[in-house]
């Protein structure tokens, strides 16, 4: 489904990703963990073509982008990759002047050129799927953060992607709203959708992911099954990270 080989990404002299090589199989859930500044979000942006790779190659659902490709071919392949991927960001990025339903169907009308009645029917089904059918005519300003993020998930699903990418989808939410978004993602996992999730929700990653990828300083430090990673991380860097996360969780529980 996703094949990455020797991926590097630099912003000027700053090398953010360094020789990343990994695979994501169809129907699997991969959680990417790591401290802030480790390159996790940049990796997702490169997969989705929102950031141009500096070196290496990325293949998504049989479509490949690589460093020595002609500009014309790369632009075409990036466009095709975006059609195969849905992305949900930390910020919801909903159109404030459009209702929940209008946000969901916007791309169906403008990109897929779908008939409005068909798009509305699909949009309503997607809002039902995330428990927001009754909010279809509500504007984002009247929705909670968790509800807005669920609308954003519906919007990404509307394009029928082969893989969903989540960039810390709960980081902007109040603690009491986190579970409603995680529950939607968990349902997608149960349905067998391919998911790549950057997250700081350790318990969620432990319960839902098929594989953990731990990044630090722009490289993949460690990867493995959740039960192995959380019980006995192989590297000192991963052990230190998990201890810090456990300490943070304990402090939050005291508040």
What are these language model-derived features?
Residues 223-224:
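ABC ATPase "signature
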Residues 138-141, 159, 191:
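Conserved signature/switch motifs of ABC ATPase nucleotide-binding domains
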Residues 56-67:
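Conserved ABC transporter NBD signature motif
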Residues 48:
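Helix-to-loop junction immediately C-terminal to a conserved catalytic motif
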Residues 164-167:
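Catalytic Walker B motif of ABC-type/P-loop ATPase nucleotide-binding domains
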Residues 65-86, 117, 232-233:
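ABC ATPase NBD coupling module
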